[in-house]
UniProtKB/Swiss-Prot annotation:
Cofactor(s) for this UniProt protein: [4Fe-4S] cluster; [2Fe-2S] cluster
Residues involved in [2Fe-2S] cluster binding: C100, C132, C192, R264
Listed name of the protein: Biotin synthase
Family recorded in the similarity comment: Belongs to the radical SAM superfamily. Biotin synthase family.
Organism: Trichormus variabilis (strain ATCC 29413 / PCC 7937)
PROSITE patterns: RADICAL_SAM
Record-linked InterPro entries: Aldolase_TIM, BATS_dom, Biotin_synth/BioAB, Biotin_synthase, Elp3/MiaA/NifB-like_rSAM, rSAM
Example GO BP: biotin biosynthetic process
Protein task: Catalyzes the conversion of dethiobiotin (DTB) to biotin by the insertion of a sulfur atom into dethiobiotin via a radical-based mechanism.
Catalytic activity: (4R,5S)-dethiobiotin + (sulfur carrier)-SH + 2 reduced [2Fe-2S]-[ferredoxin] + 2 S-adenosyl-L-methionine = (sulfur carrier)-H + biotin + 2 5'-deoxyadenosine + 2 L-methionine + 2 oxidized [2Fe-2S]-[ferredoxin]
Subunit and interaction comment: Homodimer.
Biological or metabolic pathway of the protein: Cofactor biosynthesis; biotin biosynthesis; biotin from 7,8-diaminononanoate: step 2/2
SUPFAM superfamilies, per the entry: Radical SAM enzymes
Length: 335
Protein backbone atom coordinates (compact mmCIF):
# COMPACT_ATOMS: atom_id res chain seq x y z
CA UNK A 1 0.00 0.00 0.00
CA UNK A 2 1.41 3.39 -0.99
CA UNK A 3 1.05 6.33 1.37
CA UNK A 4 1.81 9.99 0.97
CA UNK A 5 -0.56 10.90 -1.83
CA UNK A 6 -3.93 12.64 -1.76
CA UNK A 7 -6.83 10.42 -2.75
CA UNK A 8 -10.58 10.28 -2.16
CA UNK A 9 -11.36 6.66 -3.03
CA UNK A 10 -10.31 5.00 0.22
CA UNK A 11 -12.07 1.71 0.99
CA UNK A 12 -12.83 0.73 4.55
CA UNK A 13 -10.64 -2.38 4.30
CA UNK A 14 -7.67 -0.27 3.19
CA UNK A 15 -8.05 2.10 6.13
CA UNK A 16 -8.41 -0.83 8.52
CA UNK A 17 -5.16 -2.23 7.15
CA UNK A 18 -3.47 1.10 7.90
CA UNK A 19 -4.95 1.21 11.41
CA UNK A 20 -3.77 -2.36 12.09
CA UNK A 21 -0.14 -1.84 11.06
CA UNK A 22 2.45 -2.70 13.71
CA UNK A 23 2.40 0.36 15.93
CA UNK A 24 5.93 1.63 15.36
CA UNK A 25 5.62 1.10 11.60
CA UNK A 26 2.32 3.00 11.62
CA UNK A 27 3.89 5.91 13.51
CA UNK A 28 6.85 5.92 11.10
CA UNK A 29 4.62 5.96 8.02
CA UNK A 30 2.41 8.69 9.48
CA UNK A 31 5.43 10.78 10.48
CA UNK A 32 6.80 10.48 6.95
CA UNK A 33 3.52 11.69 5.47
CA UNK A 34 3.36 14.49 8.00
CA UNK A 35 6.83 15.74 7.05
CA UNK A 36 5.89 15.60 3.38
CA UNK A 37 2.90 17.92 3.76
CA UNK A 38 3.50 19.93 6.95
CA UNK A 39 6.24 21.65 8.93
CA UNK A 40 6.93 19.03 11.65
CA UNK A 41 8.28 21.68 14.01
CA UNK A 42 5.04 23.65 14.16
CA UNK A 43 1.99 23.09 16.35
CA UNK A 44 -1.06 25.32 16.10
CA UNK A 45 -2.29 26.36 19.53
CA UNK A 46 -6.02 27.09 19.66
CA UNK A 47 -8.34 28.64 22.23
CA UNK A 48 -11.96 27.55 22.61
CA UNK A 49 -14.47 30.08 23.94
CA UNK A 50 -17.87 28.80 25.01
CA UNK A 51 -19.90 31.82 23.92
CA UNK A 52 -23.21 30.20 24.93
CA UNK A 53 -23.16 27.37 27.45
CA UNK A 54 -25.66 24.63 28.33
CA UNK A 55 -29.37 24.30 27.73
CA UNK A 56 -28.99 22.42 24.45
CA UNK A 57 -32.16 20.49 23.46
CA UNK A 58 -30.25 17.62 21.82
CA UNK A 59 -29.52 14.26 23.44
CA UNK A 60 -25.85 13.66 22.59
CA UNK A 61 -24.99 10.97 25.14
CA UNK A 62 -21.54 12.34 25.91
CA UNK A 63 -22.40 15.99 26.40
CA UNK A 64 -22.72 17.86 29.69
CA UNK A 65 -24.44 20.73 27.90
CA UNK A 66 -27.59 18.77 27.04
CA UNK A 67 -30.66 19.99 28.93
CA UNK A 68 -31.80 16.36 29.16
CA UNK A 69 -29.14 15.39 31.70
CA UNK A 70 -28.42 16.46 35.27
CA UNK A 71 -24.83 17.69 35.19
CA UNK A 72 -22.85 20.40 36.93
CA UNK A 73 -23.02 22.70 33.92
CA UNK A 74 -24.92 25.90 34.59
CA UNK A 75 -26.61 27.40 31.51
CA UNK A 76 -25.05 30.68 30.44
CA UNK A 77 -26.53 33.19 28.01
CA UNK A 78 -24.63 34.37 24.94
CA UNK A 79 -21.55 36.31 26.00
CA UNK A 80 -21.23 39.96 25.09
CA UNK A 81 -18.86 40.85 22.29
CA UNK A 82 -16.39 42.76 24.47
CA UNK A 83 -15.86 39.76 26.74
CA UNK A 84 -15.13 37.53 23.75
CA UNK A 85 -12.73 40.08 22.26
CA UNK A 86 -10.84 40.42 25.56
CA UNK A 87 -10.47 36.63 25.88
CA UNK A 88 -9.21 36.45 22.30
CA UNK A 89 -6.74 39.29 22.85
CA UNK A 90 -5.27 37.55 25.88
CA UNK A 91 -5.04 34.28 23.97
CA UNK A 92 -3.22 35.99 21.10
CA UNK A 93 -0.66 37.38 23.53
CA UNK A 94 0.03 33.80 24.64
CA UNK A 95 0.74 32.67 21.08
CA UNK A 96 -2.69 31.34 20.13
CA UNK A 97 -3.39 31.67 16.41
CA UNK A 98 -6.90 30.19 16.21
CA UNK A 99 -9.99 30.93 18.30
CA UNK A 100 -12.98 28.61 18.20
CA UNK A 101 -16.32 30.00 19.36
CA UNK A 102 -18.78 27.34 20.49
CA UNK A 103 -22.49 27.80 21.19
CA UNK A 104 -24.69 25.05 22.62
CA UNK A 105 -27.32 25.36 19.91
CA UNK A 106 -29.01 22.68 17.84
CA UNK A 107 -28.93 24.98 14.83
CA UNK A 108 -28.22 28.53 13.82
CA UNK A 109 -31.27 30.79 13.68
CA UNK A 110 -31.55 34.07 11.81
CA UNK A 111 -32.02 36.33 14.80
CA UNK A 112 -30.27 38.98 16.88
CA UNK A 113 -28.07 36.37 18.59
CA UNK A 114 -26.67 35.24 15.25
CA UNK A 115 -26.07 38.89 14.37
CA UNK A 116 -24.05 39.23 17.58
CA UNK A 117 -21.99 36.16 16.67
CA UNK A 118 -21.25 37.69 13.27
CA UNK A 119 -19.93 40.80 15.03
CA UNK A 120 -17.74 38.65 17.28
CA UNK A 121 -16.33 36.83 14.26
CA UNK A 122 -15.51 40.08 12.49
CA UNK A 123 -13.82 41.69 15.48
CA UNK A 124 -11.67 38.66 16.36
CA UNK A 125 -10.76 38.11 12.69
CA UNK A 126 -9.68 41.76 12.52
CA UNK A 127 -7.16 40.94 15.28
CA UNK A 128 -5.32 38.71 12.82
CA UNK A 129 -6.53 35.42 14.28
CA UNK A 130 -8.14 32.47 12.54
CA UNK A 131 -11.73 32.15 13.77
CA UNK A 132 -13.62 28.86 13.85
CA UNK A 133 -17.26 28.53 14.93
CA UNK A 134 -19.24 25.52 16.09
CA UNK A 135 -22.88 26.55 16.31
CA UNK A 136 -24.81 23.47 15.20
CA UNK A 137 -26.56 22.98 11.88
CA UNK A 138 -26.67 25.89 9.47
CA UNK A 139 -27.90 26.77 5.99
CA UNK A 140 -25.84 27.88 3.02
CA UNK A 141 -27.09 31.46 3.43
CA UNK A 142 -25.96 31.47 7.06
CA UNK A 143 -22.59 30.06 6.06
CA UNK A 144 -22.23 32.87 3.54
CA UNK A 145 -22.97 35.45 6.24
CA UNK A 146 -20.25 33.92 8.39
CA UNK A 147 -17.89 34.00 5.42
CA UNK A 148 -18.64 37.70 4.88
CA UNK A 149 -17.87 38.33 8.56
CA UNK A 150 -14.45 36.76 8.00
CA UNK A 151 -14.94 33.26 9.41
CA UNK A 152 -11.98 31.00 8.68
CA UNK A 153 -13.45 27.60 9.60
CA UNK A 154 -16.69 25.93 10.66
CA UNK A 155 -16.66 22.89 12.93
CA UNK A 156 -19.29 20.19 12.62
CA UNK A 157 -18.09 16.79 13.84
CA UNK A 158 -19.40 13.45 12.62
CA UNK A 159 -18.67 12.05 16.11
CA UNK A 160 -18.62 8.38 15.05
CA UNK A 161 -19.61 6.02 12.22
CA UNK A 162 -22.98 6.22 10.50
CA UNK A 163 -23.85 2.75 11.85
CA UNK A 164 -23.11 3.58 15.48
CA UNK A 165 -24.36 7.14 15.37
CA UNK A 166 -27.98 6.51 16.42
CA UNK A 167 -26.71 4.78 19.57
CA UNK A 168 -25.21 8.10 20.67
CA UNK A 169 -27.58 10.71 19.23
CA UNK A 170 -31.23 10.55 18.15
CA UNK A 171 -32.13 14.22 17.75
CA UNK A 172 -30.02 14.83 14.65
CA UNK A 173 -29.23 12.45 11.79
CA UNK A 174 -25.90 11.62 10.23
CA UNK A 175 -27.22 13.10 7.00
CA UNK A 176 -27.94 16.35 8.84
CA UNK A 177 -24.27 16.55 9.75
CA UNK A 178 -23.07 15.82 6.24
CA UNK A 179 -25.54 18.36 4.84
CA UNK A 180 -24.14 21.06 7.11
CA UNK A 181 -20.63 20.27 5.89
CA UNK A 182 -21.87 20.53 2.31
CA UNK A 183 -23.50 23.88 3.06
CA UNK A 184 -20.19 25.20 4.38
CA UNK A 185 -18.50 23.95 1.21
CA UNK A 186 -20.65 26.35 -0.82
CA UNK A 187 -18.46 29.12 0.62
CA UNK A 188 -14.73 29.70 1.08
CA UNK A 189 -14.98 28.83 4.77
CA UNK A 190 -12.83 25.81 5.58
CA UNK A 191 -14.29 22.66 7.15
CA UNK A 192 -13.38 21.22 10.55
CA UNK A 193 -14.85 17.76 11.18
CA UNK A 194 -13.72 14.77 13.21
CA UNK A 195 -14.95 12.52 15.97
CA UNK A 196 -14.79 11.24 19.52
CA UNK A 197 -13.04 8.15 20.84
CA UNK A 198 -14.50 6.26 23.80
CA UNK A 199 -18.23 6.33 23.05
CA UNK A 200 -18.41 2.54 23.14
CA UNK A 201 -17.69 2.29 19.43
CA UNK A 202 -15.72 -0.54 17.82
CA UNK A 203 -12.53 -0.20 15.82
CA UNK A 204 -14.64 -0.77 12.72
CA UNK A 205 -16.72 2.27 13.71
CA UNK A 206 -13.60 4.40 14.05
CA UNK A 207 -12.34 3.25 10.68
CA UNK A 208 -15.74 3.84 9.05
CA UNK A 209 -15.83 7.40 10.36
CA UNK A 210 -12.38 8.06 8.91
CA UNK A 211 -13.50 6.53 5.62
CA UNK A 212 -16.45 8.93 5.46
CA UNK A 213 -14.16 11.91 6.06
CA UNK A 214 -11.42 10.65 3.72
CA UNK A 215 -13.85 10.23 0.82
CA UNK A 216 -15.08 13.82 1.05
CA UNK A 217 -13.64 15.85 -1.80
CA UNK A 218 -11.96 17.99 -0.64
CA UNK A 219 -10.94 16.52 2.70
CA UNK A 220 -11.78 18.59 5.78
CA UNK A 221 -8.96 21.06 6.28
CA UNK A 222 -9.15 20.24 9.99
CA UNK A 223 -9.80 16.86 11.65
CA UNK A 224 -10.16 16.98 15.45
CA UNK A 225 -9.60 13.73 17.34
CA UNK A 226 -11.38 14.00 20.69
CA UNK A 227 -11.08 11.66 23.67
CA UNK A 228 -14.22 11.19 25.73
CA UNK A 229 -14.13 12.68 29.20
CA UNK A 230 -16.80 10.91 31.20
CA UNK A 231 -19.23 13.46 32.65
CA UNK A 232 -21.31 12.50 35.67
CA UNK A 233 -24.99 12.63 34.84
CA UNK A 234 -24.62 11.73 31.16
CA UNK A 235 -25.41 8.27 29.74
CA UNK A 236 -21.70 7.67 29.06
CA UNK A 237 -20.45 8.54 32.55
CA UNK A 238 -19.25 4.97 33.17
CA UNK A 239 -17.39 4.43 29.90
CA UNK A 240 -13.82 3.12 30.35
CA UNK A 241 -10.86 5.33 29.46
CA UNK A 242 -9.52 5.11 25.93
CA UNK A 243 -6.04 3.49 25.81
CA UNK A 244 -3.47 6.03 24.69
CA UNK A 245 -2.24 3.77 21.89
CA UNK A 246 -5.76 3.79 20.43
CA UNK A 247 -5.48 7.57 20.29
CA UNK A 248 -2.08 7.37 18.59
CA UNK A 249 -3.37 4.84 16.05
CA UNK A 250 -6.35 7.05 15.24
CA UNK A 251 -4.19 10.13 14.76
CA UNK A 252 -1.68 8.26 12.61
CA UNK A 253 -4.38 6.73 10.43
CA UNK A 254 -6.08 10.10 9.96
CA UNK A 255 -2.73 11.62 8.98
CA UNK A 256 -2.09 8.95 6.35
CA UNK A 257 -5.53 8.99 4.73
CA UNK A 258 -5.92 12.81 4.85
CA UNK A 259 -2.35 14.06 4.33
CA UNK A 260 -3.04 17.78 3.98
CA UNK A 261 -5.49 18.12 6.87
CA UNK A 262 -4.58 19.52 10.25
CA UNK A 263 -5.09 16.69 12.75
CA UNK A 264 -6.06 18.25 16.06
CA UNK A 265 -5.42 16.57 19.40
CA UNK A 266 -8.50 18.09 20.99
CA UNK A 267 -10.74 17.31 23.97
CA UNK A 268 -9.36 14.86 26.52
CA UNK A 269 -5.70 15.83 26.04
CA UNK A 270 -5.34 16.89 29.68
CA UNK A 271 -5.11 13.29 30.86
CA UNK A 272 -2.19 12.50 28.53
CA UNK A 273 1.37 12.82 29.79
CA UNK A 274 4.00 14.79 27.89
CA UNK A 275 5.47 11.53 26.62
CA UNK A 276 2.08 10.34 25.38
CA UNK A 277 1.44 13.67 23.69
CA UNK A 278 4.86 13.46 22.05
CA UNK A 279 3.84 10.18 20.41
CA UNK A 280 0.67 11.89 19.16
CA UNK A 281 2.77 14.65 17.57
CA UNK A 282 5.10 12.08 16.03
CA UNK A 283 2.04 10.34 14.57
CA UNK A 284 0.89 13.52 12.85
CA UNK A 285 -1.10 15.65 15.28
CA UNK A 286 -0.23 19.29 14.68
CA UNK A 287 -2.71 21.24 16.79
CA UNK A 288 -3.80 21.49 20.43
CA UNK A 289 -6.24 23.52 22.51
CA UNK A 290 -4.83 25.49 25.40
CA UNK A 291 -6.14 27.87 28.07
CA UNK A 292 -5.06 30.40 30.68
CA UNK A 293 -7.71 29.74 33.30
CA UNK A 294 -8.05 25.93 33.43
CA UNK A 295 -11.70 26.34 32.55
CA UNK A 296 -13.46 23.59 30.74
CA UNK A 297 -12.91 22.94 27.06
CA UNK A 298 -16.40 22.70 25.60
CA UNK A 299 -17.41 22.79 29.28
CA UNK A 300 -16.85 19.07 29.69
CA UNK A 301 -13.11 18.55 29.47
CA UNK A 302 -10.26 20.17 31.44
CA UNK A 303 -7.90 22.06 29.18
CA UNK A 304 -4.13 22.32 29.86
CA UNK A 305 -2.85 25.83 30.49
CA UNK A 306 -0.62 27.93 28.26
CA UNK A 307 2.43 27.78 30.52
CA UNK A 308 2.40 23.98 30.75
CA UNK A 309 1.94 23.71 27.00
CA UNK A 310 4.73 26.19 26.29
CA UNK A 311 7.03 24.18 28.54
CA UNK A 312 6.10 20.99 26.70
CA UNK A 313 6.62 22.53 23.26
CA UNK A 314 10.01 23.89 24.32
CA UNK A 315 11.02 20.48 25.65
CA UNK A 316 10.05 18.80 22.37
CA UNK A 317 11.66 21.46 20.18
CA UNK A 318 8.32 22.56 18.75
CA UNK A 319 7.06 26.06 18.04
CA UNK A 320 3.66 27.72 17.85
CA UNK A 321 2.34 28.11 14.32
CA UNK A 322 1.21 31.58 13.24
CA UNK A 323 -2.25 32.21 11.74
CA UNK A 324 -2.64 30.95 8.18
CA UNK A 325 -3.84 32.71 5.10
CA UNK A 326 -7.17 31.24 4.05
CA UNK A 327 -6.22 28.10 2.07
CA UNK A 328 -7.93 27.14 -1.12
CA UNK A 329 -9.51 23.68 -0.75
CA UNK A 330 -7.52 20.94 -2.47
CA UNK A 331 -10.00 19.44 -4.95
CA UNK A 332 -8.68 16.65 -7.12
CA UNK A 333 -9.94 13.68 -9.03
CA UNK A 334 -9.43 10.23 -7.57
CA UNK A 335 -5.91 8.97 -8.11
Amino acid sequence: MSVGRIRYDWHTAEIRAVYDMPLLELIYQAASVHRQFHNPKQIQVCKLISIKTGGCPEDCSYCAQSSRYQTEVKPQALLDKQTVVEIAQNAKQKGVSRVCMGAAWREVRDNSQFDRVLEMVKDVTDMGLEVCCTLGMLTTDQAKKLETAGLYAYNHNLDTSSDYYSTIITTRTYSDRLNTIENVRQTNVTVCSGGILGLGESIDDRVAMLQTLATLNPHPESVPINILSQVEGTPLEDQPDVPVWDVVRMIATARIVMPTSDVRLSAGRARLSQVEQAFCFMAGANSIFSSDDNKMLTVTTPCPDYDADQEMLNLLGLEMRPPSQRPQPVVMGNS
